Amino acid sequence: MSKKLLIKTWGCQMNEYDSSKMADLLNAANGYELTEEPEEADVLLLNTCSIREKAQEKVFHQLGRWKTLKDKKPGVVIGVGGCVATQEGDHIRERAPYVDVIFGPQTLHRLPEMIKQSQTDDAPVMDISFPEIEKFDRLPEPRAEGATAFVSIMEGCSKYCTYCVVPYTRGEEVSRPMDDVLFEIAQLAEQGVREVNLLGQNVNAYRGPMHDGEICSFAELLRLVASIDGIDRIRFTTSHPLEFTDDIIAVYEDTPELVSFLHLPVQSGSDRILTMMKRPHTAIEYKSIIRKLRKARPDIQISSDFIVGFPGETDKDFQDTMKLIKDVDFDMSFSFIFSPRPGTPAADYPCDIPEQVKKERLYELQQTINAQAMRYSRLMLATEQRVLVEGPSKKNLMELRARTENNRVVNFEGSADLIGQFVDVKITDVFANSLRGELVRTEKDMDLRSVISPTQMMAKTRREDELGVATFTP
């Protein structure tokens, strides 16, 4: 009988990526199979996020529910990982002594040994250190789960914005070697992945070492990923304005695989608030980046992050943010009311903004961006859009769900053999959170590159001399 593993994940796409790697690692090392039923699980892992308010209490509430299961089934292993584990490791040991394993984002590769050790030790096993990029050397080969895949290319952040815990929970910026990133993506492409999303807390700060000792820039990496057979779409998240350099913008001019959609957080449109946040750019500098991007790629759409109610934010500061939103014409956003994160400088800033004012500002901001997003969606009506078919529709299992370049879900009628392929659809209706389309053409009628695996490519160019020594022509 196989052992069962349950992983509950909160937070960003990096956490989702980490959780998938935990599952692969424990399956490869110990044969654990995933389950969604806590009662079935032999190992319960909680991958946490400390960005939002009351993150710690949310963790302890979940652990309390799992303690009930452990009381009934004493052999169950409970583990806590992610950013809250890094921040609150000692506190978790004190308040929840029944937790067996505590690990950070950079030590998840040690999970098999930690779980094994916890089964013989009375005290919780804890490792929340920052061993740089070691975890990627210990993970099993990537396993595709559909036509899209996330690939982490760097970890941590060195910007130390005053409101953010990431540098304290994930460490400073460390980039994976270029060859490792390309090899992982090539492996995924061989398994049918067509779209890759490059991940990092500050992804465009990527500076990956190459085999010859040189450093690969993010712009160079984008072009190299685009050259991999089978990869027809590239996304990346999350980027920072400081590192959004002209060489990256130039990639938008000559690399069609890079989608015409960018998430570029700005947080505020007020220069005064940006200074208090320790954001190293002004609103005008941010708009300058957007102008250059739209010159390189006129149809690009932009999404962003916003924090309202930051300590000291005045009505004028907020109106500056609203002006930026309208000037840039953002398509989407992740927007939140400021919540102080323990251990960050902004947690000590005095704040006398009434809660009702914060809520009203957030509502106004979200309504404005939602209206802009709906306008963009309506402009797509009656147009043809190239979409990647991701799977069955979540609303109607007899239909298919696909995604546009600008990150909109399109539901349409089509056969299951289209899953994992690109198709062209005509947009026939627009809704708040999705579009409806009609199938126009399938991939066989498109002029896409043929997918040739490395094995097939080498077989085509293999030449042997009289001694049987093979050579290959790239």
Curated annotation (Swiss-Prot):
Q: Name what cofactor the protein needs.
A: [4Fe-4S] cluster
**Enzyme Commission (EC) number:** 2.8.4.3
Protein's UniProt keywords contain Iron-sulfur: yes
This protein's GO CC annotations? cytosol
Q: Where are the transmembrane segments?
A: none
Q: Which UniProt keywords apply?
A: 4Fe-4S, Cytoplasm, Iron, Iron-sulfur, Metal-binding, S-adenosyl-L-methionine, Transferase, tRNA processing
Catalytic class of the enzyme: transferase
Q: Where is the MTTase N-terminal domain?
A: 3-120
A Pfam family of this chain: TRAM
Record-listed [4Fe-4S] cluster 2 binding positions: C157, C161, C164
Q: Where is the major localization of this protein?
A: cytoplasm
Where's it found, cell-wise?
Cytoplasm
Q: Name one GO molecular function term.
A: metal ion binding
Q: Which residues form the TRAM domain?
A: 378-441
PROSITE patterns in UniProt: MTTASE_N, MTTASE_RADICAL, RADICAL_SAM, TRAM
Source organism, top-level taxon: Bacteria
Q: How does it assemble?
A: Monomer.
Its job: Catalyzes the methylthiolation of N6-(dimethylallyl)adenosine (i(6)A), leading to the formation of 2-methylthio-N6-(dimethylallyl)adenosine (ms(2)i(6)A) at position 37 in tRNAs that read codons beginning with uridine.
Q: Which family does it belong to?
A: Belongs to the methylthiotransferase family. MiaB subfamily.
Task: Kindly provide the name given to this protein in its UniProt entry.
Answer: tRNA-2-methylthio-N(6)-dimethylallyladenosine synthase
Q: What is the species of this protein?
A: Vibrio parahaemolyticus serotype O3:K6 (strain RIMD 2210633)
